Regions:
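Conserved "landmark" site that anchors the functional core of diverse proteins
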Residues: 1-357, 361-395
Length: 395
């Protein structure tokens, strides 16, 4: 009698893991920076948080970060997902899947992500309810270098099984306008922490900011290396700290600090070191860090200096838009969100369908947030002050 009874867990089975698919959550591990534990978490936190909002997850819900080439996943039970970040040409049982909108997946369906195309290199798969993974040091984020967190403390491999969580969920939200990903970026930066003219003169800093930099192939979650003109230094060496002028006595680093390791700048990432002995003349504004998660080898970027108040306003605008999304009243509606053969419908929340295309969910834009990758440092997004820190400070 029991022979005919089968059990299928609420899970996702990994058919192939892709290049580097890991479990991450936001804001990652906090208050451990002083003992050398980085926060980890999604490199493009804006896309990650946006996806969680769209499927109705609270902040802190774990999802998947996909890099360069994506995984193939089979769902053993119904689920609701949202894809954000770079375009990986995702398909569900062969039908194209839109990004930036909640999608219902049926039991037995297979989600396949290919290679990232266009701008950006990281994508995110957010699942309603999250993933049933035990936190480590307060977070489910994977820290591969430290070999802890996430699923088995590593990137996903074929044969893995991820159990779905039972996290509290709100109704799904309308489709959102995703940040535009490009191959040419402008990153708004704050002057410092090492702004003393002993390291770089004002003219030296002007040259660094005016230069066009190219993303080096040896870039990852630890840091993004940049190739560009050799910097001029205000001194011949580092004195008692070292032979090169970039050498200083060990000091704490900030995530997003532009760290000159010799003559090569490195933008420190969420898996980077918490301290070191190199000069950091500028730091990426916290609201701009999502762009660092999307730059890929060969991309070009420039730095644009802004002030502390302006950086605060940028962060507050970003936070306010995400909070506004969470406060939208849920109105259940349906619309096809998978294009191609075998179109399926997913339940999502929207104020009203598009007038021009009644089958298209309405789009919610992150008002006041630089979604272009080309920050000019002026305009609507800089209008309102905020009491929050501007640069990513040690957690």
């Amino acid at each position: 009698m029991l022979d005919g009874i089968g059990f299928e867990p609420r899970a996702v089975r990994v058919v192939s893991g892709g290049t580097a698919t890991t479990v991450q959550d936001w804001p990652g591990r906090q208050r451990l920076w002083a003992v050398g534990v980085p926060p980890s978490g999604p490199m493009d936190d804006l896309s990650f948080r946006l996806g969680n909002r769209l499927v109705g997850n609270p902040e802190g819900t774990a999802g998947l970060e996909v890099v360069h080439t994506g995984p193939t996943l089979t769902f053993t039970s119904p689920a609701r997902i949202c894809l954000t970040g770079a375009d990986f040409g995702a398909t569900l049982d062969g039908a194209a899947v839109s990004r930036g909108v909640a999608v219902d997946v049926e039991a037995g369906q297979t989600l396949s992500l290919g290679r990232a195309s266009g701008g950006g290199i990281r994508g995110y798969i957010l699942i309603a309810g999250g993933l049933d993974i035990a936190p480590y040091l307060g977070s489910r984020s994977t820290f591969e270098l430290g070999q802890f967190g996430g699923h088995a403390a590593r990137r996903l491999l074929a044969g893995d099984t991820l159990h779905l969580g039972d996290g509290a969920m709100e109704p799904a939200l309308p489709a959102a306008a995703l940040p535009r990903l490009t191959n040419e970026w402008t990153l708004r930066v704050l002057y410092g922490p090492h702004g003393a003219p002993d390291f770089f003169t004002a003219d030296d800093i002007d040259e660094i900011v005016a230069a066009e930099w190219q993303v080096h192939y040896n870039s990852n979650r630890t840091g993004v290396r940049l190739v560009g003109p050799k910097p001029r230094w205000a001194r011949a060496d580092g004195g008692e700290a070292g032979l090169h002028p970039s050498n200083i006595h060990d000091n704490p680093y900030a995530i997003g600090a532009v760290d000159f390791t010799g003559d090569m700048p490195v933008i420190l990432g969420p898996d980077g070191p918490s301290l070191g002995g190199f000069v950091c003349p500028v730091t990426i504004a916290k609201a701009e860090l999502w762009k660092v998660g999307q730059v890929k080898p060969g991309d070009k970027l420039r730095f644009h200096p802004i002030g502390f108040q302006q950086a605060q306003s940028l962060e507050q605008a970003q936070l306010g838009s995400l909070e506004a999304m969470a406060a939208i009243s849920a109105v259940t509606t349906s619309g096809p969100i998978i294009q191609g053969s075998g179109v399926r419908k997913a339940t999502h929340s929207a104020a009203a369908p598009s007038a021009s295309r009644p089958d298209t969910p309405s789009v919610h834009s992150l008002s006041g947030v630089d979604m272009s990758g080309q920050g000019c440092g002026h305009g609507k997004e800089c209008a309102s002050p905020a009491p929050r820190p501007a640069a990513a400070a040690p957690g």
